[in-house]
Amino acid sequence: YNIPYLDTQDSRGLIPQSNSNNIFAARSKAMSEADLVILLGRKLDYQLAFGSPAVFKEAKFIRISESALELTDNRRGFPEILSDPGVAIELIHNKLNKSNFDETWINDIKNFHLEKIKKVLDKEVNKTGDDNKINPNLIFEKLKNIIDEDFIGIADGGDILSFARVGLHSKYYID
Protein backbone atom coordinates (compact mmCIF):
# COMPACT_ATOMS: atom_id res chain seq x y z
CA TYR A 1 0.00 0.00 0.00
CA ASN A 2 1.28 3.48 -0.75
CA ILE A 3 -0.47 5.08 2.22
CA PRO A 4 1.44 7.23 4.73
CA TYR A 5 1.44 5.66 8.19
CA LEU A 6 1.78 7.15 11.66
CA ASP A 7 1.99 4.92 14.67
CA THR A 8 1.21 5.60 18.30
CA GLN A 9 2.18 3.89 21.53
CA ASP A 10 -0.37 1.14 20.92
CA SER A 11 0.74 0.31 17.39
CA ARG A 12 4.46 1.03 17.52
CA GLY A 13 6.40 -1.67 15.69
CA LEU A 14 3.56 -2.97 13.53
CA ILE A 15 5.17 -1.27 10.57
CA PRO A 16 8.95 -0.84 10.91
CA GLN A 17 10.45 2.65 10.93
CA SER A 18 12.40 1.62 7.83
CA ASN A 19 9.17 1.14 5.83
CA SER A 20 8.87 3.92 3.24
CA ASN A 21 5.26 4.59 4.31
CA ASN A 22 6.16 5.22 7.96
CA ILE A 23 6.39 9.01 8.19
CA PHE A 24 7.06 9.36 11.93
CA ALA A 25 9.28 12.44 11.46
CA ALA A 26 6.48 14.28 9.63
CA ARG A 27 3.87 13.66 12.31
CA SER A 28 2.69 17.25 12.92
CA LYS A 29 2.68 18.17 9.23
CA ALA A 30 0.79 15.02 8.27
CA MET A 31 -1.81 15.51 10.98
CA SER A 32 -2.44 19.13 10.04
CA GLU A 33 -2.55 18.55 6.26
CA ALA A 34 -4.31 15.19 5.95
CA ASP A 35 -7.66 15.18 4.22
CA LEU A 36 -8.35 11.56 5.21
CA VAL A 37 -7.37 9.67 8.36
CA ILE A 38 -8.02 5.94 8.63
CA LEU A 39 -7.97 4.68 12.22
CA LEU A 40 -7.38 0.95 12.54
CA GLY A 41 -8.42 -0.64 15.82
CA ARG A 42 -7.73 2.28 18.10
CA LYS A 43 -9.39 5.05 20.04
CA LEU A 44 -9.10 8.73 19.26
CA ASP A 45 -7.22 9.66 22.41
CA TYR A 46 -4.69 12.27 23.50
CA GLN A 47 -2.03 10.82 21.16
CA LEU A 48 -4.19 11.93 18.25
CA ALA A 49 -5.47 15.12 19.89
CA PHE A 50 -8.88 13.42 20.24
CA GLY A 51 -9.36 14.09 16.51
CA SER A 52 -9.61 17.82 17.17
CA PRO A 53 -10.30 19.98 14.09
CA ALA A 54 -7.66 22.36 15.49
CA VAL A 55 -5.06 19.66 14.70
CA PHE A 56 -6.74 17.75 11.87
CA LYS A 57 -7.91 20.81 9.99
CA GLU A 58 -9.52 19.29 6.89
CA ALA A 59 -9.53 15.59 7.75
CA LYS A 60 -12.38 13.17 7.34
CA PHE A 61 -12.11 10.07 9.51
CA ILE A 62 -12.74 6.46 8.57
CA ARG A 63 -12.78 4.40 11.75
CA ILE A 64 -12.32 0.63 11.55
CA SER A 65 -12.35 -1.60 14.61
CA GLU A 66 -13.54 -4.91 15.99
CA SER A 67 -14.77 -2.99 19.04
CA ALA A 68 -17.86 -0.80 18.80
CA LEU A 69 -16.52 1.30 21.70
CA GLU A 70 -13.47 2.29 19.65
CA LEU A 71 -15.72 3.54 16.86
CA THR A 72 -17.81 5.98 18.86
CA ASP A 73 -15.48 7.76 21.28
CA ASN A 74 -14.73 11.44 20.67
CA ARG A 75 -14.88 12.53 17.02
CA ARG A 76 -17.10 10.23 15.00
CA GLY A 77 -15.95 8.64 11.80
CA PHE A 78 -17.70 8.61 8.48
CA PRO A 79 -17.96 5.78 7.94
CA GLU A 80 -17.50 3.73 11.10
CA ILE A 81 -16.79 0.12 10.16
CA LEU A 82 -17.22 -2.69 12.69
CA SER A 83 -14.82 -5.23 11.20
CA ASP A 84 -11.50 -6.95 11.52
CA PRO A 85 -9.11 -4.12 10.54
CA GLY A 86 -6.98 -6.44 8.37
CA VAL A 87 -9.96 -7.57 6.32
CA ALA A 88 -11.32 -4.04 5.96
CA ILE A 89 -8.01 -2.50 4.89
CA GLU A 90 -7.49 -5.26 2.32
CA LEU A 91 -10.90 -4.49 0.78
CA ILE A 92 -10.14 -0.75 0.79
CA HIS A 93 -6.77 -1.43 -0.83
CA ASN A 94 -8.37 -3.53 -3.57
CA LYS A 95 -10.77 -0.68 -4.33
CA LEU A 96 -8.02 1.98 -4.26
CA ASN A 97 -5.83 -0.11 -6.52
CA LYS A 98 -8.44 0.38 -9.24
CA SER A 99 -8.49 4.15 -8.69
CA ASN A 100 -6.30 6.73 -10.32
CA PHE A 101 -5.68 9.37 -7.69
CA ASP A 102 -3.08 12.09 -7.36
CA GLU A 103 -0.19 10.96 -5.17
CA THR A 104 1.50 14.38 -5.07
CA TRP A 105 0.76 14.96 -1.38
CA ILE A 106 1.86 11.43 -0.46
CA ASN A 107 5.19 11.95 -2.22
CA ASP A 108 5.59 15.44 -0.71
CA ILE A 109 4.99 14.23 2.86
CA LYS A 110 7.39 11.31 2.40
CA ASN A 111 10.06 13.68 1.08
CA PHE A 112 9.44 16.07 3.98
CA HIS A 113 9.87 13.13 6.38
CA LEU A 114 13.19 12.11 4.80
CA GLU A 115 14.47 15.71 4.71
CA LYS A 116 13.60 16.23 8.36
CA ILE A 117 15.49 13.08 9.37
CA LYS A 118 18.48 14.13 7.26
CA LYS A 119 18.45 17.62 8.77
CA VAL A 120 18.42 16.21 12.30
CA LEU A 121 21.11 13.63 11.59
CA ASP A 122 23.34 16.11 9.73
CA LYS A 123 23.53 18.50 12.67
CA GLU A 124 26.86 18.56 14.40
CA VAL A 125 26.04 16.69 17.58
CA ASN A 126 29.40 16.64 19.35
CA LYS A 127 29.32 20.28 20.33
CA THR A 128 27.28 22.22 22.80
CA GLY A 129 25.08 25.07 21.68
CA ASP A 130 25.63 28.77 22.24
CA ASP A 131 23.90 28.28 25.59
CA ASN A 132 26.52 25.61 26.47
CA LYS A 133 23.84 22.90 26.62
CA ILE A 134 24.09 19.46 25.05
CA ASN A 135 22.47 18.69 21.71
CA PRO A 136 19.83 15.97 22.37
CA ASN A 137 21.00 14.11 19.26
CA LEU A 138 24.29 13.43 21.03
CA ILE A 139 22.48 11.20 23.51
CA PHE A 140 21.19 8.93 20.76
CA GLU A 141 24.45 9.05 18.83
CA LYS A 142 26.30 7.78 21.91
CA LEU A 143 23.65 5.14 22.63
CA LYS A 144 24.23 3.60 19.18
CA ASN A 145 27.74 2.63 20.32
CA ILE A 146 26.66 0.78 23.48
CA ILE A 147 23.32 -0.93 22.81
CA ASP A 148 22.50 -4.25 21.19
CA GLU A 149 20.59 -4.49 17.93
CA ASP A 150 17.41 -5.87 19.56
CA PHE A 151 17.16 -3.43 22.46
CA ILE A 152 13.83 -2.11 23.71
CA GLY A 153 13.76 1.68 23.44
CA ILE A 154 11.71 3.76 25.85
CA ALA A 155 11.52 7.55 25.64
CA ASP A 156 9.56 9.75 27.98
CA GLY A 157 9.29 13.45 28.47
CA GLY A 158 8.23 16.33 26.28
CA ASP A 159 10.67 17.51 23.64
CA ILE A 160 13.01 14.52 23.92
CA LEU A 161 10.34 12.39 22.21
CA SER A 162 10.83 14.27 18.94
CA PHE A 163 14.55 13.54 19.02
CA ALA A 164 14.01 9.93 20.11
CA ARG A 165 11.66 9.21 17.20
CA VAL A 166 14.45 10.10 14.79
CA GLY A 167 17.56 9.08 16.72
CA LEU A 168 16.51 5.99 18.65
CA HIS A 169 16.52 3.23 16.05
CA SER A 170 14.82 0.47 17.98
CA LYS A 171 12.81 -2.41 16.61
CA TYR A 172 10.83 -2.19 19.85
CA TYR A 173 10.05 1.36 20.93
CA ILE A 174 7.65 2.87 23.45
CA ASP A 175 7.12 6.53 24.32
Predicted regions and their residues:
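Glycine-rich, anion-gripping cofactor-binding loops and their flanking helix/strand elements
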Residues: Y1-I62, G167-D175
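Short, well-ordered beta-to-alpha junction loops that form the rim of enzyme active sites
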Residues: T8, D156-I160
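Short gly/pro/ser/thr-enriched loop/turn and capping motifs at secondary-structure boundaries
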Residues: S11-P16, Y46, A68-T72, I89, ...
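Glycine-centered flexibility motif
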Residues: G13, G51, S83, G157-G158
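A sequence-level detector of short, solvent-exposed, charge-rich linear segments
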Residues: P16, F24, P53-K57, E80, ...
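Generic recognition of flexible, low-complexity loop/linker segments
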Residues: A26-R27, A49-G51, F140-L143, D150, ...
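Thiamine diphosphate
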Residues: S28-A34, T72-N74, E80-I92, S162-D175
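Phosphate/pyrophosphate-binding active-site segments
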Residues: E58-G157
